[in-house]
């Protein structure tokens, strides 16, 4: 396992110097889900939530969040993102109606975009919670993780499909 890179020799936090790293195409895909009551999922699916188009607004919130990641996570580098895409799947897994969010983020740069993909997913799911909390305060955000990343010196990572 590699050592932690966000600490200097004295143990002080610092932003990693990426100036000497080559710019390469970087891609990260993250996912997560929000579980809810069947009636809440039906509201989202029908587009009749009081606050409007839940998934449309969650998509925009996720895109904005990816772009603002370095403002939220102190040691993240500001990046020129070349693509941010969010997809939603409505499903009933067992007895848990849910919305699954998947974010794909890309850049050409010296550092990866995993944090941007994770931030996009989290904020999109939080937006769904915010827009539906009046009818379902028991929603649960869960299973947020990186599915895959490509590019850079460390190469590719694919999450174990078994979890």
UniProtKB/Swiss-Prot annotation:
Annotated metabolic or biological route of this protein: Cofactor biosynthesis; molybdopterin biosynthesis
Disulfide bonds: none
Active-site residues, record numbering mapped to chain: 130
UniProt feature coiled coil, ranges: none
EC number(s) per entry: 4.6.1.17
SUPFAM superfamilies: Molybdenum cofactor biosynthesis protein C, MoaC (SSF55040)
Residues noted as binding substrate in the record, renumbered to the chain: 75-77, 115-116
Catalysis performed (reactions): (8S)-3',8-cyclo-7,8-dihydroguanosine 5'-triphosphate = cyclic pyranopterin phosphate + diphosphate
Keyword Lyase: yes
Quaternary context: Homohexamer; trimer of dimers.
Protein name according to UniProt: Cyclic pyranopterin monophosphate synthase
Naturally occurring in which organism (per UniProt): Variovorax paradoxus (strain S110)
Gene field: moaC
């Amino acid at each position: 396992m590699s050592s932690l890179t966000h600490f200097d020799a004295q143990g002080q936090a610092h932003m990693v110097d990426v100036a000497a790293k080559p710019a390469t195409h970087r891609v990260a895909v993250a996912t997560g889900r929000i579980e809810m009551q069947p009636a809440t999922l039906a509201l989202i699916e029908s587009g009749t939530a009081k606050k409007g188009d839940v998934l449309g607004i969650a998509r925009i919130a996720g895109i904005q969040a990816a772009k603002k990641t370095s403002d939220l996570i102190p040691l993240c580098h500001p990046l020129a993102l070349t693509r941010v895409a969010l997809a939603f799947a409505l499903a009933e897994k067992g007895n848990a109606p849910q919305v699954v969010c998947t974010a794909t983020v890309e850049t050409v740069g010296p550092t990866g975009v995993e944090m941007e993909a994770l931030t996009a997913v989290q904020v999109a799911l939080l937006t769904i919670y915010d827009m539906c909390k009046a009818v379902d305060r028991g929603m649960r955000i869960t299973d947020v993780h990186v599915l895959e990343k490509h590019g850079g010196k460390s190469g590719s990572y694919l999450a174990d499909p078994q979890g």
